[in-house]
């Protein structure tokens, strides 16, 4: 990128000492945004991969389909706690600071995840068991309402305008690393223990082991500095509810930007895996291992998407990626639902690159459309509501649609609907790359 382009965006060149020092802190900024999301999405992934085992332990022994619906219903409950968390923790981020938000969110998530791994079962304490499970999921969802978007805001505000997409993609990368670790851990537990032992107690291992992420994340975030935009927003102490009404347009735009990608992600990398594992228990380890390997494709696609969006423009790329996903989702889902293990891998791989690239650039794009005064609160609320509807409900809706229509390919139309809505919302938008973040 030329110095003239840097001047156009109001930035310094790489020869400036201040800019050089800022670039040296980019790694710490990226790690601070990444680590909390590793923990948060490790838990969400593990819960999805052990859904059938958790259902056996925490719900009455009704039909397998009913247990799966109940388990995925609790999975969705965590997402619906996110909007509440986004308002409370978002207000912390806007009125106190981004650093305080990130420290608080990782502590809440880490403690709730640890407790989930220690809960007594339905056979031990009856109906109190699913109620406690629901409570832990609510706390986790509450914390995630501030964590994901808070870290996106932090990394974007800390980065150069020329590198916002690339640096903020670290937050998105953290989610995939968490999914990879969750998928890999699920495969390792299933490969190391007999199926009855996994069902009885083995599923608890990942939740208890996640305490390592909690400790590392807390120590890392304790040493980060506040962003200049965070200090400015805290000094203004913006009002809460009036700001949500004032920010209605970027809230709607956020839905259009992220809905399809997240619906596709959760169907592809959570629901499809769990369905194949449930229908073919003897091949469960194969599908988990395949899922883990394909997630590496998503991981490496995220910084690529962020980097390209810095060069080409985020709106243009998101429109193109939505069209790609609309074009391949039906064929991809057919491979995931009906194919051999190799067909399953090919189906996931068709979706992996466009999903990864879209997730890598969405963070910076959404941060850029919100005003400074209420950026964390309004953005967190918009993102959380969208993920609750499009992402959190995706496994539940997919399970219901397949059960109702007796057609495993119906979820493709569910994803396509979000894609068409996204195209309609993003088409009239202007490019976001060059927008100043202190406005």
Residue ranges and their predicted role:
Residues 51-84:
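Extracellular/periplasmic helix-loop-helix junction of adjacent transmembrane segments
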Residues 48, 248-298, 391-395:
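Extracytoplasmic gate region of multi-pass secondary transporters
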Residues 165-190, 213, 382-394:
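Glycine-rich segments within core transmembrane alpha-helices of 12-TM secondary carriers
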Residues 315-362:
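C-terminal transmembrane helical hairpin of 12-TM major facilitator-type secondary transporters
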Residues 95-107, 311-323:
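Cytoplasmic membrane-interface "Motif A"-like loop-to-helix N-cap segments
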Residues 107-126, 323-339:
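C-terminal ends and interior cores of transmembrane alpha-helices
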Residues 85-98, 301-314:
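Helix-to-loop junctions at the C-terminal end of transmembrane segments
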Residues 217-224, 417-439:
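Multi-pass alpha-helical transporter architecture, strongest
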């Amino acid at each position: 990128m030329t110095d003239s382009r840097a001047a156009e965006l109001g930035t310094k060149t790489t020869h400036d000492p201040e800019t050089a020092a800022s670039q040296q802190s980019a790694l710490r900024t990226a790690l601070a945004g990444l680590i909390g999301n590793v923990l948060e999405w490790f838990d969400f992934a593990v819960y999805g991969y052990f859904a059938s085992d958790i259902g056996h332990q925490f719900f009455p022994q009704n039909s397998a389909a009913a247990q799966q619906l109940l388990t995925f219903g609790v999975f969705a409950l965590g997402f619906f706690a996110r909007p509440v968390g986004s308002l409370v923790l978002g207000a912390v981020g806007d009125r106190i600071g981004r650093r305080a938000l990130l420290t608080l969110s990782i502590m809440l998530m880490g403690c709730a995840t640890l407790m989930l791994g220690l809960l007594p079962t339905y056979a031990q304490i009856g109906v109190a068991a699913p109620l406690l499970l629901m409570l832990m999921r609510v706390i986790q969802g509450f914390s995630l309402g501030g964590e994901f978007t808070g870290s996106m805001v932090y990394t974007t505000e800390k980065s150069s305008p020329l590198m916002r997409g690339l640096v903020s993609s670290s937050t998105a990368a953290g989610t995939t690393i968490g999914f990879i670790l969750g998928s890999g851990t699920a495969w390792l537990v299933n490969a190391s223990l007999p199926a009855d032992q996994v069902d009885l107690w083995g599923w608890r291992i990942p939740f208890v082991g996640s305490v390592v992420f909690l400790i590392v994340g807390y120590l890392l975030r304790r040493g980060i500095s506040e962003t200049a935009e965070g200090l400015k927003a805290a000094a203004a102490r913006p009002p809460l509810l009036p700001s949500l009404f004032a920010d209605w347009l970027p809230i709607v735009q956020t839905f259009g930007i992220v809905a399809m990608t997240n619906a596709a992600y959760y169907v592809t990398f959570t629901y499809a895996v769990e369905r194949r594992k449930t229908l073919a228990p003897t091949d469960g380890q194969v599908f988990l291992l395949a899922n883990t390997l394909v997630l590496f494709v998503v991981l490496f696609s995220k910084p690529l998407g962020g980097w390209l969006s810095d060069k080409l423009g985020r709106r243009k790329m998101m429109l193109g990626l939505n069209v790609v996903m609309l074009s391949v989702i039906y064929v991809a889902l057919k491979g995931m639902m009906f194919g051999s293990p190799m067909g399953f891998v090919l189906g996931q791989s068709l979706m992996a690159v466009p999903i990864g690239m879209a997730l890598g650039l969405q963070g910076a794009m959404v941060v850029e459309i919100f005003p400074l005064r209420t950026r964390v609160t309004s953005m967190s609320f918009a993102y959380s509501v969208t993920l609750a509807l499009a992402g959190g409900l995706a496994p539940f809706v997919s399970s219901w649609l397949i059960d109702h229509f007796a057609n495993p390919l119906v979820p493709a139309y569910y994803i396509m609907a979000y894609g068409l809505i996204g195209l309609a919302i993003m088409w009239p938008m202007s490019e976001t790359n060059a927008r100043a973040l202190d406005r």
